[in-house]
Amino acid sequence: DDMGYGDCSINNPESKILTPNIDQLAKMGVRFTDAHSAAAVCTPSRYGLLSGTCPARTDINNFTAGRGPVIDPDEITIADLLKEQGYATHMIGKWHLGFEGGRAFDFSKPLTGGPLDCGFDSYFGVNKAPSSPPYFYIRDREPVAKPEGSIDGNEGKGMDRREIYRKGEAAPGFKPEEITEVMCHEAVKVIRDYGESDKKQPFFLYYALTSPHSPWLPSEKFKGKSEAGNYGDFIVQLDDEVGRVAKALKETGLEKDTL
């Protein structure tokens, strides 16, 4: 999310950020060197990816922080299509396509209008980027914990201004710097649950990372791993998480049966 074309070392031999796991994926598959997004920000790019509709042909042409669901109930998503073909469909990560009620979450009832209403069988993730409240994880249609507490936020200064996350409501124990690690754990769990069971049903996993969208908050063990400051270190962490997902596919024997 917000990653630049030249941030991957395979696209930029002079990059100060090494991304061996992403590079390996590129070497094993197809690399598009002249591909263009119909929209360069959060909501429309995700809308186009899931619906197949060019966002410029709709009113979904900018990011949305407070509107309701942007995917209409009668729209067909890639998850819907695969479900019709017998796939189990799972999503992990950043949704940012709205829930019923927009900004006004009503936690007295299930959260509707999200992934489970757009073709996915299961969901774990966050409503949007971890730069503004409310901060909480969602599993299927329920908050893992309601945002009944708060965090102070981080102003960010100078070259580190993209460390910023705003003060506001947060679920108990929610830490913005842990989001990518939590998401990776959930994605690997989905893969291992299939690979280590006798399930014969094919599955689709949409793994929508929040990083390297701000706030740039690499874990301690990744700090200083690049020559491009916190942003570069954050991408090194992202690359490591891509490697962990690839490793799970390999260790479960699913790598050879994966598109």
Each predicted region: which residue ranges?
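Formylglycine-dependent sulfatase
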Residues: D2-L259
